[in-house]
Design a protein with these regions (language model features):
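C-terminal cap of metal-dependent C-N hydrolases
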Residues: 362, 379-431
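Di-metal (Zn2+ and/or Mg2+/Mn2+) metal-binding site signature of metallo-dependent hydrolases
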Residues: 61-84, 229-230
């Protein structure tokens, strides 16, 4: 539910990250938090102008962003964790519970959970989601039917991209090639898993090359689960980069996870990151699920925590996004499709500081670039009047406590997220 469109005119004053405002606009220098106090003018759901405010006027203004992007999700299994738990929180437990859930997966359940996910994402301030779909087995067809239906239903609100997740070798079979053509014809991407751990055998190399060549022929992108382990450090992303370079393949390619690469020593990590940048390989880091599952020992807290080396990749010129991955399913018990929750988590987990451009871009402009979205998320004259306005006036306030928010889409204010409504569990708790 959303309110009526706002009349043309000025929106309330706000504080924006300078990195999300037109780089060509004549604006005052950002403050020490990277913020600029501005007042936006909108008409017909578009930004008409960006007006500057007097210096020192932003201290009590709300912090605002443009709607953010979720580059890696699994809508087909979201919210299934209560029914198919993984109490030990292990990779083996996740795979076993996922298998039990998949055997009972039906179109109506995927549709219901997917609708729940998109409704929450919409209210929280997400404008696009890329979701992988388990696509080899009897659950594949009903999952695709449900999510294609939801993609159409949510078009214009949350852009939904779909990736076919199968063993990489499946794309070499006649059935796999036919399915790839169907996926590409429906605007999807080809996916697969390298690992975990990935040992890079000759058969693996041949299967991956066949997938990349197939994607190039079909003109579609590839998004792989790569190196999601604490072993064989970076071997999968190294093979991907090498094949793209040697065979001069023009395939939009994303490596999701790249977790074991983070355990490389500085020199090898830097050289691999440079090779990935040269091959135009993008990366989606997934700290929530990776820190929950990888390197886990039942009797001790691990000191080595495999996750993508975001800073080293960025320094080499690799486009890096951060995603939430699994949401309340056997792979991760938390999450809620809340990009601000993910941003707050990543401060401690990945040392990403949002007051710097490269700390914010993985959730905004870099994620939009990896998904190939029409809008990069930067506000300029003519861009969508889409905002995520927070009940915090600084990054410190945002990080201190979960902020309330209001989302503006095409000049209409949305209803607040469901989490901001009083919980019925607390109905009896009053003075």
């Amino acid at each position: 539910v959303s309110a009526a469109p706002l009349p043309a005119g000025l929106l309330p004053p706000m504080r924006f990250p300078r990195s999300l405002l037109d780089p060509l606009a004549r604006l005052p220098a950002a403050d020490d938090q990277g913020l600029v106090a501005v007042q936006l003018e909108q008409a017909d759901g578009r930004i008409r102008a960006i007006h500057t405010l007097a210096a020192g006027s932003g201290a009590s203004l709300p912090l605002a962003l443009t709607p953010l992007v979720e580059p890696h999700a699994h809508l087909d299994k979201a919210f299934s964790g209560e029914s198919f738990p993984n109490p030990d929180g292990t990779m083996a437990g996740a795979m076993a519970a996922n298998g039990r859930e998949a055997a009972e997966r039906r179109a109506d359940g995927v549709r219901r959970r997917g609708e729940q996910a998109l409704e929450r994402a919409w209210r929280y301030g997400l404008r696009a989601i890329r979701s992988h779909i388990d696509s080899l087995g009897p659950w594949a067809t009903p999952s695709w039917e449900a999510l294609l239906e939801l993609r159409d239903r949510w078009r214009g609100r949350v852009e939904l991209q779909l990736v076919a997740l199968v063993p990489v070798g499946h794309w070499r079979t006649p059935e796999g090639e036919a399915f790839a053509a169907w996926v590409a014809g429906h605007g999807g991407l080809l996916g697969g898993v390298l690992g975990a751990p990935f040992r890079s055998t000759p058969a693996d190399r041949a299967a991956l090359l066949a997938l990349l060549q197939l994607a190039e022929r079909l003109g579609c992108g590839v998004d792989l689960h790569v190196d999601e382990s604490a072993e064989e450090h970076g071997r999968g992303v190294a093979l991907v980069s090498d094949l793209l370079r040697r065979h001069r393949l023009a395939v939009p390619l994303t490596c999701s996870h790249a977790s074991s690469m983070g355990l490389l020593a500085d020199g090898p990590c830097r050289r691999l990151a440079e090779a990935m940048a040269a091959a135009a390989v993008g990366v989606v880091a997934l700290p929530t699920t990776n820190l929950w599952l990888l390197g886990k020992h039942q009797r001790r807290t691990p000191s080595l925590r495999p996750q993508a080396p975001i800073r080293q990749l960025q320094e080499a010129g690799v486009t890096v996004a951060v995603g939430g991955d699994n949401v309340q399913d056997p792979w991760f018990p938390g999450g809620d499709f809340d990009p601000i929750g993910l941003l707050r988590f990543s401060l401690a987990a990945s040392h990403l500081v949002p007051w710097r451009r490269l700390g914010l871009s993985p959730f905004s402009t870099a994620a939009a670039q990896l998904l190939g979205l029409d809008w990069d998320g930067v506000l300029r004259q003519g861009s969508p009047a889409d905002l995520l306005v927070l009940g915090a006036s600084s990054w410190g306030e945002l990080l201190a406590r979960p902020p309330r928010r209001r989302v503006l889409r095409a000049g209409r204010w949305l209803e607040p997220p469901l989490c901001e409504e009083p919980s019925p569990l607390l109905a009896a708790c009053h003075g």
